[in-house]
A protein has these predicted regions:
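Short loop segments at secondary-structure junctions
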Residues: 1, 62-68, 82-84
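N-terminal strand-loop-strand
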Residues: 1-9, 35-36, 40, 62
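Conserved Nudix-box catalytic region and its N-terminal flanking loop in Nudix hydrolases
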Residues: 1-29, 117-124
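Active-site-adjacent beta-strand/loop module that shapes the phosphate/pyrophosphate-binding cleft
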Residues: 46-68, 100-101, 105-106
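NUDIX/MutT-family hydrolases
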Residues: 70-102, 122-123
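Charged phosphate-binding loop/patch that engages nucleotide di/tri-phosphates or the phosphate backbone
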Residues: 101-124
Length: 124
């Protein structure tokens, strides 16, 4: 997708009346063709915009799925070995640290903040 010129996670929005878990299941199905179950909340990414509105992205992961990968209008999908990710183009420069929130038990938050005019982040 032109909006995400590189590897990124499946994702999207929560529809009115939809739970977070149901949104994760729906978005993964729409973008990958996989039917997942038992998604577990494993972290958040959050920030405030210039008008002090807070944005929160929820990270979920699961090992429970059925089906075959199918690319969609959102982009091409494929399985990739974790060790190869550092050699591939990723959609955002912070992808390796986002992955740490998914994988490291002692991390649960990826917090962006303004440091003067620049954006910085902390892993917590």
């Amino acid at each position: 997708s032109p909006d995400w010129p590189g590897i990124t996670f499946p994702g999207g929005h929560v529809e009115r009346g939809e739970s977070f878990v149901d949104a994760v299941i729906r978005e993964v199905k729409e973008e990958t063709g996989l039917t997942i179950s038992k998604p577990q909340l494993c972290g958040i990414k959050d920030w405030y915009d210039d008008e002090d509105y807070r944005y929160v992205v929820l990270f979920y992961k699961t090992e429970h799925f059925t089906g075959e990968l199918q690319s969609s209008d959102e982009g091409k999908v494929w399985w990739e070995d974790f060790e190869n990710l550092s050699h591939l183009k990723v959609a955002t420069e912070d992808m390796s640290d986002m992955l740490r929130v998914f994988l490291e038990e002692d991390l649960s938050e990826f917090f962006y903040y303004k440091d003067g005019e620049d954006w910085s982040y902390q892993l917590k």
